[in-house]
């Protein structure tokens, strides 16, 4: 009794024609994640330092953030994207490098917005590092 083999059928990405979108840059102390969406929030492309093969402390470098932004930008340009609003979240070192990489990839940045969450005296923060 042989089980029927399932062929490897993968859904092809549909090319959308979207002029403007939003780049969400999440820059933490450990990694940088860049997601490019349309104005409604539907993801067009994404990339991160970890997904590109950077490991450990190399993920948190500005160079890794730059490479992640370039990869995400190339994927969104395939969908016809030309202009971007940028939202930056987090305290990481890859914030500025990612924005510069998006501009260098040929996308026009119309606005940069910092949406880092700031507590109004909420949860107690973690203890200070002693190095």
From Swiss-Prot:
Pfam families: Ribosomal_S11 (PF00411). Gene3D superfamilies: Ribosomal protein S11. Keywords: Ribonucleoprotein, Ribosomal protein, RNA-binding, rRNA-binding. GO terms for cellular component: ribonucleoprotein complex; ribosome. Part of the 30S ribosomal subunit. Interacts with proteins S7 and S18. Binds to IF-3. Located on the platform of the 30S subunit, it bridges several disparate RNA helices of the 16S rRNA. Forms part of the Shine-Dalgarno cleft in the 70S ribosome. This is Small ribosomal subunit protein uS11. It comes from Bacillus licheniformis (strain ATCC 14580 / DSM 13 / JCM 2505 / CCUG 7422 / NBRC 12200 / NCIMB 9375 / NCTC 10341 / NRRL NRS-1264 / Gibson 46).
């Amino acid at each position: 009794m042989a089980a029927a083999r399932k062929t490897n059928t993968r859904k092809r990405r549909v090319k959308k024609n979207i002029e403007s979108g939003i780049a969400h840059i999440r820059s933490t102390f450990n990694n940088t994640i860049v997601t490019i969406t349309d104005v409604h929030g539907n993801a067009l492309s994404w990339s991160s330092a970890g997904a590109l093969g950077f490991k450990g402390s190399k993920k948190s470098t500005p160079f890794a953030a730059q490479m992640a932004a370039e990869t995400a930008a190339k994927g969104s340009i395939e969908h016809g994207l030309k202009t971007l609003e940028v939202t930056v979240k987090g305290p990481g070192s890859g914030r500025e490098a990612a924005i510069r990489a998006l501009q260098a990839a040929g996308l026009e940045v119309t606005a940069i917005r910092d949406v880092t969450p700031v507590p109004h005296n909420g949860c107690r923060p973690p203890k200070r590092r002693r190095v």
